[in-house]
């Protein structure tokens, strides 16, 4: 791979992050304005506000981390900066996965059509429990962050003292800790929200697909507005599922496959890691009437300034 291609991927990564920051910032500003005007937010808006906020700061931290690692490869593992950056990144990453999970659960409860008593009870109680679920997610993320911080602090102390177990170098010892501690910790802490997400999103897709087929059979027309609305909802949910799965798998692979910043695949891999949190906000904006209208006006305004 030529250096120019590496520069291309680096610029693509920066553009992707900035687009994600702008999209998430737009969602947060829209909901903040609504919160100030009405004095409260709907349960769905609470989750979107929390998700947008965590993704906004996560991409800012991730952008700093990627370039700091790229510019300070040698001393990165044992630097104090790694501890500070990782402290914020681990908290925001855990919170983001949990907020995505609650968003999928809320979609499932609001849209899916099941007659099971447990589902009906959850449909009735879940909106009132959303603030507690969000608070619980933050507390869980704090605990997860402390567990990751212990590992990062161990690496930092070992780097300062130059004392490693066995006849190994710091790089080998650091890599062993990544495999034996960080990777299992990531799998355990991320599997719970991912399992909830997968169950709720698959139930919702199944319910929507069954309902869409029933409407197509009754109307005998694919041009019916209700059929088209359900088809759009299905496409949106499937894209959400794919992006979430890519994000989960890439996080796990990132803990097992070490890609150094001097590797030709470093910047393409950063693009994959941040792809979901950059693209999904635009899906949320296009599928929300309030967001879509304001966003279109902003684009037209920006286009007018650009032409002028």
UniProtKB/Swiss-Prot annotation:
Stretches of the chain found on the membrane's Cytoplasmic side: 29-60, 110-128, 208-239, 286-308
Keyword terms: G-protein coupled receptor, Glycoprotein, Membrane, Receptor, Sensory transduction, Taste, Transducer, Transmembrane, Transmembrane helix
Record's keyword annotation contains Disulfide bond: no
Annotated localization: Membrane
InterPro entries given in the database record: TAS2R (IPR007960)
GO MF entries: bitter taste receptor activity; G protein-coupled receptor activity
Topological domains annotated Extracellular: 1-7, 82-88, 150-186, 261-264
Listed CDD domains: 7tm_TAS2R41-like (cd15018)
Glycosylation site list: 152, 167
GO cellular component terms, A-Z: membrane
Task performed by this protein: Receptor that may play a role in the perception of bitterness and is gustducin-linked. May play a role in sensing the chemical composition of the gastrointestinal content. The activity of this receptor may stimulate alpha gustducin, mediate PLC-beta-2 activation and lead to the gating of TRPM5.
Protein name: Taste receptor type 2 member 41
Lineage: Eukaryota, Metazoa, Chordata, Craniata, Vertebrata
